[in-house]
């Protein structure tokens, strides 16, 4: 029997252990997609207790607590922070098999030196130990990032954001980690959502372009791409909950934009025409700038209307969608490829049934001279588990080129989430170790170690324009 979460946690055999400890463990982290606050990084936010770090915005934990029968007052309600923490401590033992169980203990070990198992009995002492650490001078969020060996943090930012905190971080010589903006124009794409007209008005205010017309709207978006580019952005991201694409014309998109601006809802076909033309336009801008484009596909969001009305979005009431993505996704990518303006692209689906679909689609759009131009993104959200990560990597290896994989990201709102990179790297090493053990791959530690380091760091460092490998 193995010890609980020891140095060889998740490592399947001796080869996996060698690969992790000698090649993967100490590689820097490139967190190319997350939801951290640039303001909190600039201000070097400090936390007064562990509940603030763990439970104030983590809908993963909120869902688990609800499923365990915890009252909402102890999750998002007005209970005090100690009681909320103890509710989480009592929930954790019930989560065996869930990555939250391992992530929780990894975070306790790595940041606070706590090796105890979190439960109802240990909760009070762990509360005291962790809060004592958080009170120390070296436990601001900057120190947590530095302690995690992070080189780049890419935040998620709306086109109308002024990026002032990113700008101040560039000028701050006391913090060497690159904190770069990520362009997320969802509110400009979701034309049927309530608030679209108000958002477009806000877009006009931060640009010199009137958004009363569709042409002006596109010029305003382009100007924000330019502004983000000037401020170090080289990554865009889209939440495409429903994957749709129709071959259309600018005239049709213009007509439907005007219809929406007059307060009318668009039909599904009209919405698809608007989104299709606008997404192609934005993809062209990204290609011209040398950006990386990310599509997060097939999420079914805000399913519980009663709780959505009480708490709003991103509070733990989302699920996997099961809509067909292959044809609209291929047609969208092909439209950009026909114009020779398909940017580097990362595709994620929340539905694991789409894994072989995406892995095969990216192979249709690869191009010589750009290794892994299209990427099958790492297991996302509900798939961000041991089995989900292994399935994603195994599918990529089955159909594509595993050695070109750009690896892990946190996609997190927590400054304690970086051990997820360690969790991922352990699984990479374990998977390769099993291939060696089964005689599928030769035991060539140098070659395999290079692949592990590439997936852990170097592939992403080469893929993104972050200026990390100036000697290459």
Curated annotation (Swiss-Prot):
InterPro entries: Metal_Hydrolase, Uronate_isomerase. It catalyses: D-glucuronate = D-fructuronate; aldehydo-D-galacturonate = keto-D-tagaturonate. Belongs to the metallo-dependent hydrolases superfamily. Uronate isomerase family. SUPFAM superfamilies: Metallo-dependent hydrolases. This is Uronate isomerase. One of its GO terms (molecular function) is glucuronate isomerase activity. GO terms for biological process: D-galacturonate catabolic process; D-glucuronate catabolic process. PANTHER family: URONATE ISOMERASE. Its EC number is 5.3.1.12. It is an enzyme of class 5 (isomerase). Pathway: Carbohydrate metabolism; pentose and glucuronate interconversion. Keywords: Isomerase.
